[in-house]
């Protein structure tokens, strides 16, 4: 028996009958993509939120960035927090998914290079290795490639199929890698 989502009206203005409206089929992969998007998107959102409201706030985040060799640390702290919050929310909602994924990839590549690469691969190593941030980048790229699924804003507005597959993979990779390389080239000046 088909599940019913709502009751609609059918007929003319003079004669209308209430009829059941079947639910659209939701595949297990759509539910899995929703869970992945929410987990990683909300997680990234809270990283950005913490940069603003946690511990030392933006000033503390800026000092931390300066200690790693980032130029204009106050600006970098604001940009990182804003990007984490906005891309996290967009990714969780499945809105502009490959663009949000590109922002996530860029953030994670910069974090991997600046904060984690000297600590090895594993996150449990002292100073935390680059395993975790690389995993986030790979998940973001995979979701951009697969598409956000039916349970997404992109699907609801009819653009999900336009941006998945190679197009989604390309958008996310170019934005992420290009953004990370640009930021590192312009802003990263480690002590020698």
List the predicted regions and their residue ranges:
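Extended, low-polarity transmembrane helix blocks
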Residues: 2-56, 60, 74, 78, ...
